């Protein structure tokens, strides 16, 4: 879709007026943040997922001529699993690993409309912009809200929105648009969306294991005033069943405690975060994901990533 500069400028102005402003702002701001501060080095654990995405997605986009010679295109992916396990953050870090690729992060509110068929129109406009800016990594957060299961009512406007998504997802990679999505509820997604050619890979991202939890504590504490004798392995053992968001909360809770102590202290600029304080923070915070929820996710994992499937519809990440 290369045109002369003046026509291209007019086209962009037109699209920016019709596509939700929030979506456009999010796309620009997240992309800049990713390039400056994010990358796989910011992720704790997820080694198998990093390798899978690097080999099947990032290397393909970063080496287009070689990929074209072998007829290879990046697959569309759905990351699913318990909340707070880093699916959205992974997508943002993933974008930072790719050269010259536009990153657009879309949330349900970005396409919401009070007008009948308004959301349907915005879906088409969004993909038009993504194609124009290609190559584009289009990331949908809370994907189940975009493509819920359809019912038998032909006049249901939400059915029409899902149908529009199906049309847009069909071989989107042929147009330079590469779709990655995340959800905590894959069972709510219309099954037609999950067919190969629309969503090629279903990847389960589970709870962080002990090594990942230790890495999370190291990353979260690395830039804070902390004692030198913190036993990270012990903290990891104490947080069995905690997700990434829980560990982040534990560190922030301890930070707030020390902040309030520091502003009272005149003799030293900062009070150090100690292991004892972190242990108290752990006792203060219960795991966000219950054992009942984990059993349900294990059932979903077996449903969506069965043992007899090929390697691209499998379990990776924190498991």
Question: What do these predicted ranges mean?
Answer:
Residues 1-52, 73, 306:
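AAA+ P-loop ATPase mechanoenzymes
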Residues 34-237, 242, 254:
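Walker A/P-loop NTP-binding motif of AAA+ ATPase domains
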Residues 13-17, 55, 215, 219, ...:
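Charged/polar, solvent-exposed surface patches and flexible loops
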Residues 4-5, 87, 293:
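Intrinsic-disorder-associated interaction segments
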Residues 8-14, 19, 111, 186-198, ...:
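A short, hydrophobic/aromatic-rich structural module that often spans a beta strand
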Residues 32-38, 47-51, 63-70, 237-249, ...:
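C-terminal engagement/docking regions of AAA+ P-loop ATPases
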């Amino acid at each position: 879709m290369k045109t002369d500069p003046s026509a291209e400028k007019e086209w962009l102005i037109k699209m920016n007026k019709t596509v939700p402003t929030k979506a456009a702002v999010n796309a620009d701001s997240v992309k800049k943040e990713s390039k400056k501060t994010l990358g796989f080095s910011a992720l704790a654990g997820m080694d198998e997922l990093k390798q899978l995405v690097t080999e099947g997605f990032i290397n393909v986009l970063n080496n287009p001529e070689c990929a074209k010679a072998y007829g290879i295109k990046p697959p569309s992916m759905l990351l699913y699993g318990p909340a707070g396990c880093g699916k959205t953050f992974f997508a943002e870090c993933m974008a930072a690993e790719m050269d010259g690729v536009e990153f657009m992060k879309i949330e349900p509110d970005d396409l919401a409309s009070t007008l009948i068929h308004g959301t349907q129109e915005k879906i088409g406009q969004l993909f038009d912009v993504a194609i124009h800016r290609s190559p584009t990594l289009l990331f949908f957060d809370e994907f189940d809200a975009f493509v819920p299961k359809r019912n038998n009512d032909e006049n249901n406007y939400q059915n029409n929105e899902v149908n529009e998504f199906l049309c847009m997802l069909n071989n989107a990679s042929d147009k330079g648009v590469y779709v990655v999505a995340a959800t905590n509820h894959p069972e709510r997604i219309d099954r037609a969306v999950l067919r190969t050619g629309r969503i090629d890979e279903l990847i389960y991202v589970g709870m962080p294991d002990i090594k990942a939890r230790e890495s999370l504590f190291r990353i979260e504490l690395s830039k804070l005033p902390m004692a030198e004798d913190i036993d990270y392995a012990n903290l990891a053992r104490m947080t069995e069943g905690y997700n990434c968001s829980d560990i982040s909360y534990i560190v922030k809770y301890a930070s707030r405690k020390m902040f309030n102590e520091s502003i009272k202290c005149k003799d030293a600029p900062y009070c150090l975060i100690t292991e004892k304080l972190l242990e108290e923070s752990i006792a203060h915070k219960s795991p966000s994901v219950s054992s009942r929820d984990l059993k349900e996710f294990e059932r979903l994992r077996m449903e969506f990533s069965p043992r007899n499937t090929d390697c691209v519809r499998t379990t990776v990440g924190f498991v």
